[in-house]
């Protein structure tokens, strides 16, 4: 199994640069350097101007896309790729469910390393099929010809912004015909044509144009309901646990959700969620100490635990000093959309991607962010990137996992920066890899501080 996944990864490394040079500008799913936030900003950029004309929306979803991809079409698209036979074997390998083997004559294995790339290969050309035309192609592509629709796709979810309902109907008809040879159809229950004044949900955000002409992007009502429900379930399950357990469980959920939705108009929703969390932990505290008065409970669990915030109602542990983060502590940022057809695989764009990384501020603590910027995103001991990842997390849960991984993989430690072992020895706080820290303790690294390599931006 491990060898097979490694072979799939090797195949992706061989295929991806070729297809990245071909893929359409507004395809954002499962591609290096692109993600959900780019897709949301692409829609916002198209429809946010007061004189915007593309206000009719085809909101479409493909029915069980991974299960029905046509194998012949995929293999034909790969042309003379040397590992084409390997791809065919993966596609027809079959699945084992409940101990029973079922052969696969269509579809791509979900969870496979190569499956997302296969999906993008199968759906390449969708913009052209919908009638989208650009003034320029390649890296600078992005400005569409007047009168044509704009299609934004993330994997098998897509939004087509059109000038009229008739144009939206035409786009749907064209795409229905184009998808048929690929074995795909629209999900009738999840596909609709609507006007932006009614709002549309996409990738967890609600995008709506209001009567005053403003277009606002907010967390969708369904996303808010889900996080409220999850927080309630988690706190209920923690009855009988101590405050440290509550904080350890809720902090990743809060920071992960806030990190994903920080690019929208989310401040009021963040504040409302903080109120919801406060009520949950207050109820937890009252149930934990049912025989204690309210004043005792609030004095024990609430206070100014975060020294950098003037907030006396932070939930925390008097024993450890750990405290519960708040949604509103995550600043709202404006995401900068990736430019046209730019790809990290293009060596001519190395400076562009380095500049883009430098301008990116990950949702980490102020001290961590300051150290990252001072160190140009690199570990001073091994000179490797500290926050390297193939792509930005694409959901609140992925952000939870990413932030947890960063906490596990990095350490803030005092490092000798000058004159080790001399009277002039200087020590400064640095962010280093956890494994570099272990090696330093074992004598694997010298005590002398190693200067960083040429700055290439934050990972």
Language model features with spans:
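A conserved non-catalytic segment of reverse transcriptases
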Residues: 92, 182-257
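Charged boundary/loop elements
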Residues: 13-29, 449-456
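Conserved polymerase palm-domain catalytic core
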Residues: 22-199, 390, 444
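Histidine-centered nuclease catalytic patch
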Residues: 386-432
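Active-site-adjacent bridging/hinge elements
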Residues: 88-103, 248-251, 346-356, 408-410
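Short Cys/His-centered divalent metal-binding micro-motifs
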Residues: 384-387, 424-452
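Extended C-terminal regions of large enzymes
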Residues: 274-370, 374, 378
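Right-hand nucleic-acid polymerase module
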Residues: 234-295
């Amino acid at each position: 199994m491990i060898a097979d996944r490694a072979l799939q990864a090797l195949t992706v490394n061989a295929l991806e640069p070729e297809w990245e040079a071909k893929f359409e500008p507004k395809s954002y799913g499962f591609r290096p350097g692109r993600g959900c936030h780019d897709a949301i900003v692409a829609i916002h950029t198209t429809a946010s101007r007061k004189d915007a004309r593309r206000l009719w929306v085809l909101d479409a979803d493909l029915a069980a896309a991974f299960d029905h991809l046509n194998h012949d079409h995929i293999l034909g698209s790969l042309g003379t790729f040397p590992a084409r036979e390997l791809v065919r074997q993966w596609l027809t390998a079959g699945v084992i469910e409940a101990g029973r083997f079922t052969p696969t004559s269509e579809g791509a294995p979900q969870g496979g390393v190569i499956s997302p790339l296969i999906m993008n290969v199968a759906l390449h050309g969708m913009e052209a099929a919908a009638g989208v035309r650009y003034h320029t192609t390649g890296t600078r592509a992005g400005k569409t010809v007047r009168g044509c629709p704009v299609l934004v796709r993330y994997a098998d979810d897509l939004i087509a912004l059109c000038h009229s309902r008739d144009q939206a109907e035409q786009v749907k008809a064209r795409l229905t015909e184009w998808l048929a040879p690929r074995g795909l159809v629209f999900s009738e229950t999840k596909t609709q044509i609507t006007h932006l004044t009614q709002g549309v949900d996409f990738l967890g955000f609600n995008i709506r144009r209001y009567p005053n002409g403003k277009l606002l992007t907010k967390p969708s009502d369904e996303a808010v309901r889900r996080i409220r429900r999850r927080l309630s379930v988690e706190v209920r399950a923690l009855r009988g646990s101590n405050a440290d357990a509550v904080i350890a469980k809720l902090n990743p959920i809060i920071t992960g959700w806030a990190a994903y939705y920080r690019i929208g108009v989310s401040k009021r929703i963040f504040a409302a969620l903080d109120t919801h969390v406060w009520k949950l932990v207050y109820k937890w505290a009252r149930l934990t100490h049912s025989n204690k008065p309210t004043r005792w409970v609030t004095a024990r669990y609430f206070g100014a635990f975060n020294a950098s915030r003037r907030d006396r109602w932070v939930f925390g542990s008097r024993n450890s000093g750990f405290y519960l983060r708040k949604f509103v502590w995550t600043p709202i940022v404006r995401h900068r959309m990736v430019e046209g057809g730019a790809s990290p695989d293009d060596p001519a764009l190395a400076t562009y991607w380095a500049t883009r990384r430098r301008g990116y501020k990950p949702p980490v603590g102020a001290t961590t962010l300051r150290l990252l910027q001072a160190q140009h995103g690199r570990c001073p001991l091994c000179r490797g990137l500290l926050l390297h990842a193939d792509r930005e997390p694409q959901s609140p849960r992925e952000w939870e996992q990413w932030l947890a991984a960063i906490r596990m993989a990095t350490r803030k430690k005092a490092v000798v920066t000058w004159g080790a072992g001399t009277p002039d020895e200087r020590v400064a706080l640095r962010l280093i890899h956890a494994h570099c820290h272990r090696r330093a303790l074992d004598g694997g690294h010298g005590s002398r501080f190693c200067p960083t390599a040429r700055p290439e931006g934050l990972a």
